[in-house]
Amino acid sequence: MSATVRAVVPGGTDDLPEVGGVATDTPEYFCLLTRAGAALEAAAHAAGKPVRLSVIAVGDGDGEVPVPTDDAVALVHEVYRRPIDSLSQDEEDPNICWVHIVIPTTEGGFWIREFGVWAEPLEDDGEPVLYAYGNHAPFYKLKSVLGQATTHELSVPIIMSGTADVEIVVSEAGYASRLELLQIAGVVED
């Protein structure tokens, strides 16, 4: 299956932001497939191999919220990376799966303004590929200090369609949110 990354706009297009007083047809915060990600898909398809998405990284954008472009090959300023913790199927669209990381309370002391989904190289001696790149509403991730602590969950939608095989590698040491644990325990319904 081919994976395409897109922005999901809560509430549909009526909620699109105004930029400079003019309504836009794109959301302010979004994620897109990079050229390197598309090239990796094509090479994987030709080689009969899957694209393996395994890591999500976040960055502070070097103090600014970047505008994602498909020519990105790295984050502007990466501050944290983590193996993908979990994935879930979209409740409304079976062609969309969500990849998630949870940044735990023990990590922090940085701003999040950008993120990237990294794919493993096709060859053992290759370099990981920035598969998808997006921006993030500015969020300060606290580190557990003096009784204050936060976790932060980042979820990225991946749209599956039909030309390349995409695998999402979930860390064996994945992190479950409190809600997920309650759902597993049967205390909270879906």
Predicted regions span which residues?
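A signal for long, low-complexity, Ser/Thr/Asn-enriched, surface-exposed stalk/shaft
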Residues: 176-190
